[in-house]
Amino acid sequence: MGGIVAATGPGSKAETQPATDGTAVADAGAYAGAPAPPDRVVLELLSPELPWLMAIAFIAGLVDAAVGGGGLIQLPGLFTTLPQHSPAALFGTNKFSSVFGTSAAAWRYARSVRFPWRPVLFAAGAAFAFSFLGATVVSLMPKDAVRPLVLALLVLMLGYTLMKKDFGALHRPRQVGRRELSIALAMGALIGFYDGFFGPGTGSFLIFLFIRFFGLDFLRASAASKVVNLATNIAALSFFVPSGNVLLLFAVPMAAANIGGAVTGTQLALRGGTPVIRKLFVLLVLVLIARMARDTFGH
């Protein structure tokens, strides 16, 4: 007589029960570790959250390409939309999708804007290496101790930018020598460590430092920051992907949307130039200060 195979529990033997239609039907999904059936995969692909997450990814890519700070939009969107998933999986999904948008923005900027490649590549190499170090010590240092310092740096950075009306307005690149390359290495190491350990405001800090130490205007500083930010994102993915902490069913469509936003944001930045990017930069830093103040004093 035919029967239906059902698992009574993890590791238990299957029990055979009579089938009402006289046939033997195997319930493959009853076994622990069985792959999800195709219809379930389709349902996840058609998840009602996906269009919303793609819209968030598009906006994040647009903002990030122009002035940085896309993570301030995309990461909270993931946490509020997919609260059932682990933080590591959401961080990995955010990095996976954003690395494609950052790549698209870096490529568009590199083809349209000239900036000194040597210090940028030195900074990118150091940032890639030190982002690993930042990620490894993330559990050893309390983040609450870092927030007041970051808040103070953001306030100083905003004050400096507002007081110097010509800050980043003109492109006055400095001659690149050993001193400048040493500064680029130190800058990349600090930013890479910070991005691997903490993260918020990485793009804003990079733009500020490229203007302050290399004489770039806002447009070229934003372009240079994308190359360094791309290095830190790739380093982060080398942690998240091997450990399986990327929700590919969401990450891949979000990556496509992020690319679309990045292309749009880059085009807006190139058309608007330094004045537009400066205004967006000040606005973004204000948002960062408000968020950091809330996290620091809101407990």
Residue ranges and their predicted role:
Residues 4, 36-86, 171-222, 252:
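Selected transmembrane alpha-helices and immediately adjacent juxtamembrane segments
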Residues 6, 10-51, 299:
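Short, strongly hydrophobic alpha-helical membrane anchors
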Residues 55, 59, 100-103, 125, ...:
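Lipid-exposed faces of alpha-helical membrane segments in multi-pass integral membrane proteins
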Residues 85-94, 118-122, 215-226:
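Membrane-interface alpha-helices at helix entry/exit sites of multi-pass transporters
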Residues 92-145, 233-276:
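Selective hydrophobic functional segments
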Residues 104-114, 135, 151-176, 287-299:
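Transmembrane helix exit motif
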Residues 116-126, 174-180, 223-228, 276-282:
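Cytoplasmic-side transmembrane-helix entry/capping segments in multi-pass membrane proteins
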Residues 133, 190-198, 236-244, 251, ...:
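Hydrophobic alpha-helical transmembrane segments in multi-pass integral membrane proteins
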